[in-house]
Amino acid sequence: MNIRSNPETTRAAVTTGALPSSKKIYATPASAPDLRVPLREIILSEGAGEPNLPVYDTSGPYTDPTVVIDVNKGLPRPRTEWVKQRGGVEQYQGRDIKPEDNGNVGAAHAAKAFTAHHQPLRGLDSPPPRGEGSGVGGATPAAFARGADHPPMITQYEFARRGIITKEMIYVAERENLGRKQQLERAEAALADGESFGAAVPAFITPEFVRDEIARGRAIIPANINHGELEPMIIGRNFLTKINANIGNSAVTSSVEEEVDKMVWAIRWGADTVMDLSTGRNIHTTREWILRNSPVPIGTVPIYQALEKCEGDPVKLTWELYKDTLIEQAEQGVDYFTIHAGVRLQYIHLTASRVTGIVSRGGSIMAKWCLAHHKESFLYTHFDEICDLMRKYDVSFSLGDGLRPGSIADANDRAQFAELETLGELTKIAWAKGCQVMIEGPGHVPMHKIKINMDKQLKECGEAPFYTLGPLTTDIAPGYDHITSGIGAAMIGWFGCAMLCYVTPKEHLGLPDRNDVKTGVITYKIAAHAADLAKGHPAAQLRDDALSRARFEFRWQDQFNLGLDPDTAQAFHDETLPKDAHKVAHFCSMCGPKFCSMKITQDVRDYAAGLGDNEKAALYPVGHAGMTISGTIEDGMAQMSAKFKEMGSSVYLDAEKVKESNKALS
């Protein structure tokens, strides 16, 4: 159903309510009984003869009927207390909102500001004076575990390196296990069946495993300390493959209301993170509305807003303006920033011979700035300062691929890989500063060139999580690039990519609407799940097997509901067989009642089950374990062999002679 908010504040309406035959459930980790980790339970029909199936859920409170949704107030903020309990942070006034933050929009076009204001948190630069900052019962807060001579820890990476398991780590471990007590035998069998290309997927995810993966830099929990509404999730190749959905307004279309609706719509269908790529008016306000209503991590490309602040002219960009934009967005609670610090002056000429040049918006902005000033990129020269700033808020890096190929003709060229090598250098700097890092990747890459991208990224970037846009495997299908890219996404996900950025049917053609968002999300959920199956993820195949059993047993409603998109599955079925009676029929409109292979198979099974021992034995080949009547089969085979020789040992025989021979045998 839709809940419409107060029209005097905003006209936003978002989709709420459970998916068909599903309910929101919560798991409680043994080590943190105060946590409630969300899952979606798919309720199977009474005749299924098997338990309901819990699945990963990204939809937040919007599918919980016990929660009253009011987009004007935003979601609850339980994570804020987790952060404060760890210590090492301070609450402060924050910067004032400036006219340029919203593109100097006039009053006639200004969006309504979000009503609730939360003072931001930031990490302390140094420990508090001795005797201050103690935790509950006088205990030292976790942030100060390195001692009084060291600055407090703020980021998940710093806690992990110190050996401290945070609530976020406990939360994501429970989430990755889907709330089930693992059946290790089945899990190990699934792992043995898959090909993980060096990934170390365990049979059971523990908080300690999560901590270790983050400490090694192989995984991140994007979780700004100011995003209190967040339900933590993890990105890494040894976990479930995640997907991102892009939303955002532009200078010519969309509104705040539409973008909030698209965010809720995207997470309903399975988006693990959402990027707000707004480039038009009301950027700050749009982002605030999205963040305050988002249970998933939100990413941005700060250079887009910085460009709006200087009238859209890349030449006018400055480090000071960009730094102010980073602070603005970090205070709001953005969880990860795409920063194109690998676009260096010396690499730009490498793109001159490309078919499609520089296709990244952020990459082209920085390339123009570098050429106009004939200087090294300020993102590169000020990278240490960027790290210090992002660490204060635990904003994760998503190091952008500003020189990614925009056509398969440009795939894997020197410009692309030169930037990737620089991103590897920057990753090590960010880690040394205590920041979490993932790496962005292409783009447009034909199938035979995909694996080298994954292998080179792992080598150059120390196994930091890879996050790719597709890649698109061919350039000939405008309007269908969700398919051309879904092929590449499934492949690179199998090879080890941790998160896949969706592509919608509108790619290269226009701004996606909510229908395009759903199509993109479902397409990429398929790709991510296919990758998890191929890697041998221990829980991945449970849903496939449940749906296959429902299909074979003609449990149509279970078949719809176990799918990624129950609404579309049932709509297609009902186009030709709409009646309730058809939901229990043992056929569909493809084959009809007489030619359904599964119905025929069921009839054969039923027939075999009713046979006596002698009749069953006749169905088995010689020596088969099912043959229980000694000599019966051997005698029959010997008789038929003699008959074959008697008839002339020919494959094709005269019909009349065969009839006469059969009479003699009877």
Curated annotation (Swiss-Prot):
PANTHER family: PHOSPHOMETHYLPYRIMIDINE SYNTHASE, CHLOROPLASTIC, THIAMINE BIOSYNTHESIS PROTEIN THIC
GO cellular component labels: cytosol
Name of the protein: Phosphomethylpyrimidine synthase
Species this chain originates from: Rhodopseudomonas palustris (strain ATCC BAA-98 / CGA009)
Keyword annotations: 4Fe-4S, Iron, Iron-sulfur, Lyase, Metal-binding, S-adenosyl-L-methionine, Thiamine biosynthesis, Zinc
Reactions performed catalytically: 5-amino-1-(5-phospho-beta-D-ribosyl)imidazole + S-adenosyl-L-methionine = 4-amino-2-methyl-5-(phosphooxymethyl)pyrimidine + CO + 5'-deoxyadenosine + formate + L-methionine + 3 H(+)
Keyword check for Iron-sulfur: yes
Record text on subunit structure and interactions: Homodimer.
